[in-house]
């Protein structure tokens, strides 16, 4: 192992970027629990200070996917809608809520998530409060995607090896490459993804990373401080289509909506969030809350080939108003 790891660590000390293969080798050793914690901290720090390249991120993601527990991958188009978290704004659980609304609009979603990073209640905390089984088997999860159109893959169940990095990450108390890997390592391996990132500087590099992860169609977004499509300002988008990246900006008007202040979509602790999300999914939320979810669903629908954002937004709002989106929450809770 030293023959593999020493040249990689030396390269990082010299602030040289790793090839995708070298990054994959490094993270393979980390995930198998074979790297000394001091060396791991050194490598993660060197990567952070240098700035992780798309090759390094893709290599790390491929190592984690190669070591993940298996999932029976659907042979149809299906998506993940996910944010890195860590934007520090504690909004309502937009992407989790949007997953149910997207399914009510006819899309297939296999959402990968974990406990909270930035909101007081992460997606798994919220699903837990609705009685959705986070420990559902891979087979049952796949069946839920087939039959209900939406299911949730809880990261620790598939990525046990990440625990080897936890003590180092907790001691370092700073963002590392692991903070951006979560959305790239969905064990179901979706071919469509809407991914929000906590910094505008990450939009292009993450899109370049996704290009190497053989996505059919994807978009990376940062919305005026949020790791989501914004309803309070502009959203920077890098979209992957036909193997090319197109960058553009979206505003609430592009979705046919009025802007709303960021304060209007603040979240709470899990119990409060449960009430807020129930209201949204039954059409009883505020215009800001419904809009915040609808714009994210609308962009995800575009990735499935429904290009008209305004029509998509209306369809998403209707799926909430009709209560159809909330029925899927109940179906998923009853599924296991």
UniProtKB/Swiss-Prot annotation:
GO terms for molecular function: anthranilate phosphoribosyltransferase activity; magnesium ion binding. One of its GO terms (biological process) is L-tryptophan biosynthetic process. Its EC number is 2.4.2.18. Mg(2+) 1 binds at residues 95, 228. 5-phospho-alpha-D-ribose 1-diphosphate binds at residues 83, 86-87, 91, 93-96, 111-119, 123. It catalyses: N-(5-phospho-beta-D-ribosyl)anthranilate + diphosphate = 5-phospho-alpha-D-ribose 1-diphosphate + anthranilate. Keywords: Amino-acid biosynthesis, Aromatic amino acid biosynthesis, Glycosyltransferase, Magnesium, Metal-binding, Transferase, Tryptophan biosynthesis. It is an enzyme of class 2 (transferase). Anthranilate 2 binds at residue 169. Binds 2 magnesium ions per monomer. Pathway: Amino-acid biosynthesis; L-tryptophan biosynthesis; L-tryptophan from chorismate: step 2/5. InterPro entries: Anthranilate_Pribosyl_Tfrase, Glycosyl_Trfase_fam3, Glycosyl_Trfase_fam3_N_dom, Glycosyl_Trfase_fam3_N_dom_sf, Nuc_phospho_transferase. Mg(2+) 2 binds at residues 227-228. The keyword Glycosyltransferase applies. Anthranilate 1 binds at residues 83, 114. It comes from the Bacteria. Its cofactor is Mg(2+). Homodimer. Belongs to the anthranilate phosphoribosyltransferase family. Catalyzes the transfer of the phosphoribosyl group of 5-phosphorylribose-1-pyrophosphate (PRPP) to anthranilate to yield N-(5'-phosphoribosyl)-anthranilate (PRA). This is Anthranilate phosphoribosyltransferase.
